[in-house]
Amino acid sequence: MARMSRRVFTLSALSVLAATGGGAAACGAAAPRSGTAARAAAGRPAPEAGRASRAPAEMRGVWLATVTNRDWPSRPGLTAAAQRGELTAHLDKAVRDRLNTVILQVRPTADALWPSPYEPWSECLTGRQGRNPGWDPLGTAVREAHARGLELHAWFNPYRIALHADPTRLTASHPARRHPDWVVPYDGRLHYNPGLPEVRAFVQRAMLDAVARYPVDAVHFDDYFYPYPVAGQTFDDADAYDRHGGAFGSRAAWRRDNIDRLVREMAAGIERVRPGTRFGISPFGVWRNAATDPRGSDTQAGVQTYDDLHADTRKWVRENWIDYVVPQLYWHIGYADADYAELAAWWAETARGTRTHLYLGEALYKAGAAEEPSAWQDPVELSRHLTLAAAHPQVRGHVFFAGKEVAADPIGAMARVVADHYERSAKPPR
């Protein structure tokens, strides 16, 4: 969570973050919540954390990334029939592996995999941004997933505009070209400025259009809020800070508040547009290192979401702002800088006593990859993750990155997970 350090998650970004020890908020009164939290607020009890609630229900998910045609479609420009065929093949493979949820990336770069009145058709479909593919991928995905007993979670990236820095390459009608003041170039990419209230309102309208049109089971964000930091570069939001940051003691605090507002307003919008639809986020796996904050994990990660992405993921869980969280724990058991075992325990403790469901993001893409250490050459590594996580009652399941690896399973790591842990089908938690 696409998750990841999701999140998408491009493999190049994941590799850079891994090399640095990484992996791939204060708004006043509580906003209305979607899904589980809304039901609890209405006086209906949320399921208690613990083995009794885990037994009949377990998240078994897969991310299906569309950015750069990572997982689907296999390449741009396929016929509508070929794209449908590839999509249903992914859904069928999920059913065969006794998974129960597909998290489909439907807004990878400020574009759309449905006929949006706000943003252009995604170039991953036809190779040309704005070109109608001749069918409705998101509508079809929801219908075909539900026909197979799968949940379909719509995965959106809120602020990424493009994986390049040239606005003229965007289709002429793109909102970023109509509002160049909304755009911040950074790290060779284009980003919407999270510090502008008009940007935050716009991206919510664009995303909620899909929720209004289709009975998606959940809305899903990945790990990209403010962009991952790049040495020697500055994300230029000084003008927005001068206009809107006066109430904050630092730009970092203001930025965290901007992301907090996005999360809370989106939760309220989902509940307003389609009540009962859940809202989940898949952050980078380290909130803060304990050396930075005693509440943090015993890790030495090069990226900390609170400080670097300005995403206070711990608070979102502790204060029940979201229905589920899927931290991207894309490291092996025993990894010195970010041990999977340490982080699984830290997130379990963070979720303890909350209504936020905890699922763990799993780096299936690393299994058998030549550049990965020996732990990832063992097809049993991921199965060990699930065995270890079962000792924490707060862990209600796992999501695998990503669809291409579920389909190919080069060293049999997914097959081992299925054989060891997914002998019978399971419904996703509600």
Please provide the spans of the model-predicted regions.
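Aromatic- and acidic-residue-enriched segments that line the glycan-binding/catalytic groove
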Residues: 114-126, 160-186, 224-246, 291-301
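Substrate-binding cleft of secreted/luminal carbohydrate-active enzymes
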Residues: 313, 323-335, 354-429
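Catalytic domains of carbohydrate-active enzymes, especially glycoside hydrolases
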Residues: 85-110
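Aromatic-lined carbohydrate-recognition surfaces of secreted/lumenal glycan-active proteins
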Residues: 153-157, 220, 255-303, 357-361
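Active-site-adjacent "subsite" loops/lids of carbohydrate-active enzymes
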Residues: 65, 69-81, 159-209, 307-308
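Aromatic-lined substrate-binding rim segments of carbohydrate-active enzymes
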Residues: 108-156, 251-266, 273
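Substrate-binding cleft/loops of secretory-pathway carbohydrate-active enzymes
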Residues: 278-326, 331, 335-339, 343
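N-terminal export signals
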Residues: 2, 7-30
